[in-house]
Amino acid sequence: IYTLSHGSLKLDVSDQGGVIEGFWRDTTPLLRPGKKSGVATDASCFPLVPFANRVSGNRFVWQGREYQLQPNVEWDAHYLHGDGWLGQWQCVSRSEDSLCLVYEHRSGVYHYRVSQAFHLTADTLTVTLSVTNQGAETLPFGTGWHPYFPLSPQTRIQAQASGYWLEREQWLAGEFCEQLPQELDFNQLAPLPHQWVN
């Protein structure tokens, strides 16, 4: 576990999965504290690379060619959230308030190198993901994070969105809806919803 700090902010990061295991302001958790179990879904936040979520049927067509993906966890039939959250990352630089980890993946459809940089200032955590395709073919890539927030009556969230995807069977993205219902509109600071939202 790598521990970064700056003023009242503290961040714990693991090289197993490149996950955040905790982020605090003084003693207040800003993300759900991780269990430090080596399992990304027990962490505070994990990286999504080379894409997020699932691909229907574990297959996609890109530039006229079909690509087949293999499930990457025992408990889901899909190639879930890519590989970064399951891999062993390497530390390439570290200071009291900054850390840079890299991960290289060279099996299956995707061959890539991703770097994840963490930086604390007095009042901000900045996390940056950068991925480079190292395969022979051009492929679609995406990056993101899967954060877990503390669930309490005081928890508030704000995130810009102009729409959302309905969830269909097997947690796959369904139809895109441009009209956000009030309980899912986080363009302004709002409490967390009371129902499951994926």
Set out the residue ranges of the language-model regions.
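Beta-strand-rich N-terminal accessory domains
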Residues: 1-69
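Beta-strand-rich recognition/accessory modules
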Residues: 1-5, 40-43, 100, 106, ...
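Hydrophobic residues embedded in beta-strands of well-ordered beta-sheets
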Residues: 2, 20, 99, 125-127, ...
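Acidic, contiguous internal or C-terminal segments within carbohydrate-active enzymes
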Residues: 4, 103-141, 145-147, 151
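Residues that act as N-cap/strand-start positions at coil-to-secondary-structure junctions
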Residues: 7, 17, 54, 83-86, ...
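Glycine-rich, pocket-lining loop/helix-strand segments that form or immediately flank
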Residues: 29-42, 67-89, 156-177
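Extended, loop-rich substrate-binding clefts of extracytoplasmic carbohydrate-active enzymes
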Residues: 72-122
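Active-site/ligand-binding surface loops and adjacent short beta/alpha elements
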Residues: 140, 148-198
